[in-house]
Structures are given as C-alpha cells and as structure tokens.
C-alpha cells in the first residue's frame, strides 16, 4: 500500500454484543482467516463496527465518526459528527455516509465545521437521486436503484414517509442497468407490506419480473398494475388517489422517465 495518510470514517453510535449480520449479507468473510465477521454495530449491509472473533481482525479506530443520529426522515437527516451537529436536505441513512465521507476529506484539509455546514445547506437532490417534481397534483419523488443494497436502502428511506403514497418500480435490463436482474430477489421489497401503499405500478422492459417480485412479498396482486411503456406509468401516476408518489427506477428507466418528464415540461432536461 502507498504510505499516504489514512482517514477512517464510519458510525460510532449505540453498540451491542457482537452478532452476525443479516443472513443475506455479502462481504462478511474475514480477509485474514476467512472466519465470519460479527458486528457490535451494523448500520446496513456489511458496514459497521466489525470484528473477527477467531483472529481478532477488527475495524480500525475512526478518525471521523457519526456519534449520534438525531433525526432521520424521508427528506432530511440530523446527526452529529465528532460532536458537531450537521443537517442534510436529503433522506436516507446511506446519504449520511456520503456526508460523512465529505466531512472526512474536509477534516483532513482543516475545513471548519461552519464551512461544511454551509455546503450542506446548499446541497439538494439531483438527477434521479430523490429528485422531486409534480405530475398533475401529485408530489413525486424519483429514486435511482441499481443493486440490492441500494434498493433496500431506498425502500428503508421511503418507509419513513409519514403519509400514504403510490409506488412505481421501473425495471430495465440494458447494459447500463445490468442485464442480469436477479438482484431484485436480494433487495428487501418485503418491507412494502409494512407501508401505507394503496397501489403499485410495475413498469419498464422487465415489468413482469418486478411485478412477480412484488407479488411474492405478499402485497395484494390486484393492486399491482403492469405497464411496459413509461408513458402509461406516467398516466397511471397522474390518476392515482394518493397526493404523494415514489418512483424507484433502474438507471436507464430513470433516464427515460426523466426524458418523459422533460417533454412534459415538469423538469429541466439537464440539471445544474
């Protein structure tokens, strides 16, 4: 390895006795002895405060850490890093990790917390990453999904919404999406049965596959509509009963849906 200075960052909130990660978690084999890592703190996937109880391999001491999660909503987060309060205008635990990485770099270059806070205050959701717009009178949020961990975190984020909403899941299988869509079976779509979602649209090239995945969760099959054409998904959203809608979309489906929104003059085609 290069002899460069290293900044370790992560979460250092409430700990438990070491326990195994979720059975479907990848990347939990110890790189030293090939034992199974356990976690005193497991934020999601294989991230957190890990240790191998066979050989002692463990997470290095953190340089920059989230030491308190003050508030987590579907549209924003409040948290403390190294004792300083921060706020970001975007939802989801995964975005706190993004903010934490930025703070770690800023910390290394001696950027003050006040400057970091001003930067966070100016940040906003962009280009399919919790991008908001209206379809008719519906408040809509577009969220990119592209792998099991990211999809599960997006589902965790929308689960925080304090209101009912319609849901659209758009699945394409172009090269930019990944032509193997079996990853949808590793994403925790089962959580949708715990949300107030009166109706779901399954759309995109692989609409039948995502519709099947959603039916397997136990969500009522008669409340799932399939549409290969995104124009039909758009029309469906416009006519749905809830004032809020979430659209989870793989990469090329997100691009196609944004193109449709731009043609309807609901968003700018290119975001600054």
Where are these regions (language model features)?
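Long, charge-rich boundary regions
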Residues: 56-134
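A short local loop/turn or secondary-structure capping micro-motif enriched for an aromatic residue
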Residues: 16, 95-97, 149-150
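Short glycine-rich loop/turn motifs that provide flexible caps or phosphate-binding loops at active sites
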Residues: 9, 91, 202-203
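Residue-level detector of alpha-helix boundaries and kinks
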Residues: 15-18, 40, 87, 139, ...
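Short, structured coil/loop segments at alpha-helix boundaries
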Residues: 22, 39, 89-94, 250
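Extended acidic/charged loop-beta regions that coordinate divalent cations
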Residues: 1-85
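ATP-dependent carboxylate-amine ligase
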Residues: 25-27, 31-34, 44-57, 104-113, ...
């Amino acid at each position: 390895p290069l002899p460069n200075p290293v900044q370790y960052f992560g979460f250092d909130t409430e700990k438990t006795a070491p326990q195994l990660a979720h059975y479907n978690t990848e990347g939990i084999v110890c790189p030293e002895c090939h034992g199974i890592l356990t976690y005193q703190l497991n934020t999601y996937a294989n991230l957190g405060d890990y240790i191998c109880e066979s050989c002692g391999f463990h997470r290095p001491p953190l340089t920059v850490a989230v030491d308190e999660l003050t508030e987590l909503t579907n549209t924003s987060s409040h948290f403390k890093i190294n004792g300083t309060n921060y706020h970001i205008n975007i939802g989801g635990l995964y975005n706190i990790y993004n903010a934490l990485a930025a703070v770690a770099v800023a910390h290394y270059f001696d950027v003050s917390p006040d400057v970091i806070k001003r930067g966070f205050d100016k940040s906003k959701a962009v280009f399919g990453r919790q991008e908001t717009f209206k379809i008719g009178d519906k408040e809509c949020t577009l969220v990119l999904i592209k792998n099991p961990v990211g999809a599960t975190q997006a589902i965790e984020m929308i689960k925080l919404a304090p209101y009912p909403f319609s849901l659209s899941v758009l699945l394409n299988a172009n090269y930019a999406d990944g032509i193997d869509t079996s990853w949808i079976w590793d994403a925790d779509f089962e959580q949708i049965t715990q949300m107030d979602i009166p109706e779901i649209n399954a759309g995109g090239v692989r609409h039948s596959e995502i519709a099947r995945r959603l039916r397997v969760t136990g969500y009522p099959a008669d409340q799932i509509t399939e549409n290969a054409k995104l124009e039909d998904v758009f029309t469906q959203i416009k006519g749905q009963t809830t004032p809020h809608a979430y659209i989870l979309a793989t990469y090329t489906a997100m691009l196609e849906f944004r193109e449709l929104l731009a043609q309807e003059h609901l968003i700018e085609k290119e975001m600054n």
